Swiss-Prot record:
Record keywords: ATP-binding, Chloroplast, Membrane, Nucleotide-binding, Plastid, Protein transport, Thylakoid, Translocase, Translocation, Transport
InterPro entries: Helicase_ATP-bd (IPR014001), P-loop_NTPase (IPR027417), SecA (IPR000185), SecA_CS (IPR020937), SecA_DEAD (IPR011115), SecA_motor_DEAD (IPR014018), SecA_preprotein_X-link_dom (IPR011130), SecA_SF2_C (IPR044722)
Family designation: Belongs to the SecA family.
SMART domains tied to this protein: SecA_DEAD, SecA_PP_bind
Purpose: Has a central role in coupling the hydrolysis of ATP to the transfer of proteins across the thylakoid membrane.
Residues reported in the UniProt entry to bind ATP: 83, 101-105, 492
Enzyme Commission numbers on file: 7.4.2.8
Topology term for the membrane: Peripheral membrane protein
Catalytic activity: ATP + H2O + cellular proteinSide 1 = ADP + phosphate + cellular proteinSide 2
Major subcellular site: plastid
One record GO biological process: intracellular protein transmembrane transport
UniProt name for this protein: Protein translocase subunit SecA
Gene field: secA
Amino acid sequence: MLEPFFKNYFNQSLTKYNSQVDAINNFGPMLSNLSDDEIRQRVQILKQQLLSNKNEADIICEVFAIVREATFRTLDIKHFDVQLIGGLVLNDGQIAEMKTGEGKTIVALLPTFLNALYGKGVHVVTVNDYLARRDAETVGRVHRFLGLTVGLIQEDMSPEERKQNYQCDVVYVTNNELGFDYLRDNMAFTQEEVVQRPLFYCVVDEVDSILIDEARTPLIISGPSEAPTQKYLQTSQLARVLQKNIHYIIDEKNQVVKLTDEGTLFCEQALKIADLYSPSDPWISYVLNSIKAKELFIRNTHYIVNVEEEVIIVDEFTGRTMAGRRWSDGLHQAIESKENLPIQDESQTLASITYQNLFLLYDKLSGMTGTAKTEELEFEKIYGLKVIPIPTHRDVKRKDFPDLVYKNQYLKWQAIANECIKMNEIDRPVLIGTTTIEKSELLAALLSEYNVPYRLLNARPENIESEAEIVSQAGCRGAITISTNMAGRGTDIALGGNLESLLKVKLKKFISDLVSADFSTVLKSAQFDEFLVSFVPVFETFGLSKLNESSVREDLLEYLNEGIIPDRSDITDFITAYNSFLKERAAILLEEKTLITKLGGLHVIGTERHESRRIDNQLRGRSGRQGDPGSSRFFLSLDDKLLRLFGGDQILNLLQNIGLEDDAPIQSPILTKSLESAQKKVEVYYFDSRKQLFEYDQALTMQRNGIYSERKRVLEKESLRDWIIEYGERSLYDITLAFSTNTNLALDKFFALKTQELLGMPYQVKWESAKGDINVLLNNLKHQFQVSYTLKEAQLEAIEPGIMRELERSFLLQQIDFSWKEHLQKISALRDSIRWRSYGQRDPLTDYKKESYSTFVTMLNRIRHQVIYFIFRSKITIDFE
């Protein structure tokens, strides 16, 4: 009964956009009659109106219509009405749930262009460098056509390049680069080192992957800290002889390891220590990490070991490697020891932030994905984002067949191989999604035994390089593609194959044979291979995406204008030959698409249910795009992780009661409901985990925002003298407060000691001169301090003019950074210990907030004291050589 209600609710939520879509369409005929320059002039007029405080609602329809027309002129693509609705939803700061193949990339053009007109910079966030570069080069042409600048942030860019690109109107960037640039900016020592502008508006592609899946892992910038290598080596050897369920217990659901009493005693005897938990020499964390490394972290599942003998984490949601990321709290070192690799130093956190708090810094946030509805509650509770499903342009024709469950892994993989063989015999394309590298290679080996051709895509470097090409051609006739998790792959699978990708592959194939030759001669050649070779540098330079005559002509002429190719006379021959090839290949692909459509389209095979229904839905969603036919089926085993942890025994009893043959699968509505129930339990568990992380991090977030705001003002302020004077006076106030509340020392001795300790110089005070009034005493101290500071300033300025301002800034930044680093360590230790408070009938979160705030206030006081102390103690040495 509820389903019709929700369906009507969301239909009503979209109804409000219908009038805007009609208005956008009404601008179409007028805009189509304008020249390119006239459209750009219209953009400038609208921009001025927006900057003159004209209501955005008054111009949004015309702006969207302009983007639609520009997209058609540059990419030969025209937005559908449902795509316009998607753009309006994004502009309202919501999440647009759009199925795979519905054109999310061009939908993002609409709100990004409108918000870029404010001149504050707009970010389009993607999950990897390849997608960021692809979008900047392809759809970025629309923004450039309309007069905007387009920036791109890549992993290997220098700070100067990053700053230049962040100044652009629209910036394409990955979530990783965005977060680390934010942290680095807040560690900068000069304003010139800061690369980002204030965070204004952001569209997050694959928003569920970034804001949900990666929310538990904070971004951390760390510095080296010496690792106790011997402890890791000893406990790694110890873990090898410890026995499960005797010495330790594994809670696989919660990823927790617990030592038994027998295990604790055994470890203490083996390590020849009195107490594993000794505060002065603790061993327990090393033992537990070594057991976790042995039992819970599996090579080629959770990580790989590369040729440089480094442990590289594999993202469980995307199947991609996470270069540069390390597990914290000694776990990474424990895995290195387990693999007999060099143990890297432990790291000390210098700065950190979660994606939850990073993206909440934007004035306006929106996102898009094919699968967000299952996490709707979390998006609304934590980010304040509503999920709005956008109707598909064409009805989804994919058939999702019931799951097949087998008694063991052997029977399951045999059935999957047989399914692949059956599909291959009729030339129907198949996409198989696996959960780990190990399992993808197991299936590959099995298909090799049957002489069935396949393409393999997993986190191994040699496979990643061909990722886009492998995925784009997964819809070719007879193609069998084995892939680890498909989340965030970002490339549509077109039935019959992708023409653009085919051309790219052909061009790259010939680039190695490219030799110096007269371009005019090559253009006249009838040999198409030579023609392709000659086109490689042009293609590589401009990253052509829409390969038609107009775009080729435009980019070639621009290339020629640079004087690289002196003779333009044969351009027409070149374009004619090129378009001839396009038409020929397009006709062949159309024939193949027709054939594959008759066969039923792309068939998707899932080899295991993921803990999240979203990931399963993402895999299914690769089939049946844009009204194409397709199908999906999951093949499961009772010893799959999800079934094993959540009800495998019950299902096994069901199988036995039914009395099926050993190799016969089971499929039933009861089974499907059990699986969905198991997934919901896991999703609730992880949601609670992320919610708890968010609640705890809120206290630190307020502190981080405060310290970063202060730091930013330090960089921007021309003179910090007034601040330093205020710091000194606050320090003196702290001293007088301490004296008035608690001291047994004589007044003069107390102040001499405290001012020496905190300010680096003893102040002389007499209680009689203050007439017994603490405020009079404080004013006397302030006067002494100001005189002392002025004298110190004069002394240093006489040696080197301007040095005092530099010292103030330098000492202040150094103390903020050093104190913040120590504060993060203390907060981390507090969070580790606070969990035990619940056993004492106390609320750990309340205690954490109180104690973290107290620690923060202490840190601020320490910064003030230390800055003054170092300034007064500073000396300048003059080198006369």
